[in-house]
Amino acid sequence: MSVPPDPDGRPWLLALHSSSESLGVGLQRLGAVAPERLETFPLGRSLSNGLFDCLESVLPASAWPRLGRLAVATGPGGFTGTRLTVVLARTLAQQLALPLDGISSFRLMARRLLTGPEPPGGDGPFWLLQELPRRGVVAGLYGADPGQPGGVAELEAPRLHRDREALAPHPIRPALVQLPEDVIQLLGFSGANAAEGRAAPWQPVLPLYPTSPVEALPC
């Protein structure tokens, strides 16, 4: 791929999402309102072997110095896929001295739902929930908030619950990744942060592991 020229010399915003069986990559000019490239790669367990090739098919390594900001979905998601993409994003941000926005995959889903035709919580908050066989449920609580980045408040970050009874009384929606739609949301979050001049150091950006083996199942 040849990188299209930009007469204003605006840098690129690159977004990576691997919290499902597929890798999503988005490329957008900082300050633009729409992505220039959106690609989905159904890599599954071969992500570790195909990650760099997929990234370079969207933006060649020779063009990485033209990046101005990075964004990555931090999960919850598969242990290996999420970890590899977050590590890659952190490495690029460190080596290129770029800001890095880490956004949970649940928060991206919430923004997609809130901007859809039927917001799931009406005027109030709602849960996003993922069922885990024999473990319980992973759920996060979200609501619309124009004062928050991307217009979405993460009222409770995704964590493990024994069952859905603890989630009353708010509405519950299934936590389902949709690509490339959720990559568009990731670009939107990061673009809004850039427009508002929000700092985004790479060091705090880490994968979310609600089902960590070192933590006991909630009572």
Where are these regions (language model features)?
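Generic alpha-helical scaffold signal
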Residues: 45-49, 64, 82-86
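DPxDG-like acidic metal-binding loop motif
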Residues: 69-105
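Oxyanion-binding and handling regions
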Residues: 1-35, 42-50, 101-219
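N-terminal, well-ordered alpha-helical segments
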Residues: 49, 53-56, 86, 90
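Short, well-ordered alpha-helices that flank and scaffold nucleotide-derived cofactor binding pockets
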Residues: 57, 90, 94, 115-116, ...
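A generic structural signal for ordered secondary structure
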Residues: 27-29, 63-67, 88-97, 139
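Short, functional N-terminal and low-complexity linear motifs
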Residues: 18-22, 58-59, 76-79
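Phosphate/pyrophosphate-binding loops at sites that engage ATP/ADP/AMP, CoA/4′-phosphopantetheine
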Residues: 55-69, 118, 146
